[in-house]
Amino acid sequence: MTLRVPYMPDDAIERDAEALLAQYAHARGVEMKAPIPIEDIVEKHLKLRVEFDDLHRLLNVPRSGIGLDPDIFGAIWLDTGRIVIDESLDPEERPAMEGRYRFTLAHEGGGHWRLHRGLVRSDRDQEALFADVPKPTVVCRSSQAKERVEWQADFYASCLLMPRRLVHAEWQDRLGRTKPLLLSDLRPNEKVMLRAGTLIHEQGRREVDAVDDALFESVAEPIARRFGVSRAAMRIRLEKLGLLLRVEPKQQSMKGIL
């Protein structure tokens, strides 16, 4: 099903993610550091049940991803607190997928659980008379990433796994600066350009902005490792925080002010 969700401002989503981290830190008597212990937060603190399974088989949905790879990576039953993550993301079987797994867990157990479980009853009541087998409240497919319900959960996951304060501190430690980096700062750097070319080749990308993304991801990569997320997830977060800029901000004109 597609869950109908209201608009929520970015800062409200980020505040809730920060509140969850603060609640967890207080309950455990710990200081939050990267990488964020997302499994402990979801399973021990929020007390949600997490399983791995072949989601396409479980939900009886044919595969439609590129090369028939899975395009359903997570599902959550908001009425029972059950999360199923596709077995293709199992970090014990596929260590290279750990970043994607952690983000999916934060997306389901953070984003959907914290933001959307209060919306379940009205939607469930309309389906109850027709459902023989309980279906997940939200099925997360890569093809639906731009839907509001998915965007909100994605943004929540990024705030939860990459908290603003910790990312800014890591940025300063790694780069020795608090100011943002411009795309134009990176292009003359031969080493960075070479690394970007390697990333593009590895990803098999041909989009117009692939080079720019790869340049930013070459900067984001060591920070991503520290936080246990993918290069792309960290690049997006750094751009959202204004630490990576594609164009130089325009100075505000004083015309009409003086």
Where would I find each of the regions flagged by the language model?
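Active-site hotspot residues in diverse enzymes, especially metal/ion-binding acidic/histidine motifs
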Residues: 1-258
